[in-house]
Amino acid sequence: MSAPAPTRRVVALGMLGTVIGGGLLARAAAPLTQPLPNGASDDQLRFLEEAARWNLPVLGRADAPLTLVLFFDYHCPFCRQLEPELPPLVAANPDLRVLFAEYPVLRPDSAIASRMALAAAAQGRYLPAHDWLFRVQGRYSAHMVPALAAAIGADPGRLAMTMESPPIATAIRRNLDAGQWLGIDGTPAMLSTRGEIEGAVPAPVLQQFVAAMRHAAAAGVAPERPA
C-alpha cells in the first residue's frame, strides 16, 4: 500500500513489547477500556477496500458481507485471550467474516510463527495451524514444522519450503506496512467500517460491535465490501 505517513495514532492501553525494525513500536493492547468507535477514518476505509482483495486467511464465509480485519501476533497474550471468542462470534453471525492479518511485531520469532501459518494456508490448513500456534509455549522455531504438520495434517516438506518462499515474506511485509501506515502499534487490533477497537474484547462487546456494523451496512453507510 502506498500512502502518506499516518496522521493518527491509536490510544495506548498498555505496554508489552519492543521496538522492531523501521521504528515501529510494538505492544500488546490491554483489555478493552475505551468506548466503541462511531465510524472508520478515510485511511481505514481505504485499507478495508484493499484488504478485501488480498486473499487474507478467513474465518467464516468468504463472501460474507460484514468484514472484521484482525491484526495479531502469536506472542500477544491478549490475542491469545481473544482467539477463542471468534469462532462462536462468527457462528452466531453468519453474515460476518474475520480476515486474519498476520502482524508479527512483538518478538523476532513471531515472524516464524506467521510464516508457518501462511505456509499452512497454502495447504488449506490455516485455521488448524492458527489454533496450534496459539497453544505453543515459549519461542517459535522452524524446528516445529514437523510437529505442526503432524498436528494439522499437512505435508512437512512442503510446509518448510513454502514458509521460506518470497510470497510469504511479501504477504507479511504488506501487513506490517499497512499496519504502520494505519498507526496500529498494538495487538490485537480489529478494523471494520465502524472503526478500530483494540485489546481483549469480551464476547458481548464483540457482538455489539458486529451489530453496529450490520446496522450501518443496512442503512447504506460505509459499505463493508468494495463494489
Locate predicted features.
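C-terminal cap of thioredoxin/glutaredoxin-like
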Residues: 3-25, 150-227
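N-proximal helix/coil linker or "cap" segments that precede and/or mark the start of modular domains
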Residues: 29-47
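Flexible, active-site-adjacent loop/turn segments at secondary-structure boundaries
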Residues: 46, 56-57, 101-103, 132, ...
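A short beta-strand-turn-helix
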Residues: 48-66
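Short secondary-structure boundary/capping elements
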Residues: 49-51, 81, 171
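A generic local structural motif
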Residues: 53-57, 84-85, 176-178
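Conserved strand-loop elements at the edges of beta-sheets that form or border functional pockets
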Residues: 61, 70, 199
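Structural alpha/beta surface segment adjacent to cysteine/selenocysteine redox centers
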Residues: 64-75, 80-151, 182-185, 216, ...
